[in-house]
Amino acid sequence: MSGSTGERSFADIITSIRYWVIHSITIPSLFIAGWLFVSTGLAYDVFGSPRPNEYFTENRQGIPLITGRFDPLEQLDEFSRSF
């Protein structure tokens, strides 16, 4: 075996008290932050995806599928005009 890199082993890290003190706070905090990000609707605003009640409006009930192989830009323009 070659020389030691000076790093602690994984088993040594996960059995330390300091690891669990830090991670017992950060892991639940990340979970709660993610849940709030999604449940408040901020994820829809940040990523620009439609909310569940905005997929189909009264004037647009069809599914926006690209069916033509040779004219996809025309179909995309048609779909974007309906927004």
Curated annotation (Swiss-Prot):
List the membrane topology term(s).
Single-pass membrane protein
List UniProt keywords, sorted A-Z: Chloroplast, Electron transport, Heme, Iron, Membrane, Metal-binding, Photosynthesis, Photosystem II, Plastid, Thylakoid, Transmembrane, Transmembrane helix, Transport
Q: Which residues form a coiled coil?
A: none
Residue positions binding heme:
23
- Record-level Gene Ontology MF annotations: electron transfer activity; heme binding; iron ion binding
Cofactors needed by this protein, per the record, are: heme b
- Indicate where this protein resides in the cell: Plastid, Chloroplast thylakoid membrane
SUPFAM superfamilies, per database record: Cytochrome b559 subunits (SSF161045)
GO term, biological process aspect, one: photosynthetic electron transport chain
One GO CC annotation: chloroplast thylakoid membrane
Q: How is the cofactor bound?
A: With its partner (PsbF) binds heme. PSII binds additional chlorophylls, carotenoids and specific lipids.
The protein's role, per its UniProt record? This b-type cytochrome is tightly associated with the reaction center of photosystem II (PSII). PSII is a light-driven water:plastoquinone oxidoreductase that uses light energy to abstract electrons from H(2)O, generating O(2) and a proton gradient subsequently used for ATP formation. It consists of a core antenna complex that captures photons, and an electron transfer chain that converts photonic excitation into a charge separation.
Per the record, the similarity remark reads: Belongs to the PsbE/PsbF family.
- Return the NCBIfam families for the record: cyt_b559_alpha
PANTHER family, sorted:
CYTOCHROME B559 SUBUNIT BETA-RELATED
Quaternary organization: Heterodimer of an alpha subunit and a beta subunit. PSII is composed of 1 copy each of membrane proteins PsbA, PsbB, PsbC, PsbD, PsbE, PsbF, PsbH, PsbI, PsbJ, PsbK, PsbL, PsbM, PsbT, PsbX, PsbY, PsbZ, Psb30/Ycf12, at least 3 peripheral proteins of the oxygen-evolving complex and a large number of cofactors. It forms dimeric complexes.
What is this protein called in UniProt? Cytochrome b559 subunit alpha
Name of the gene? psbE
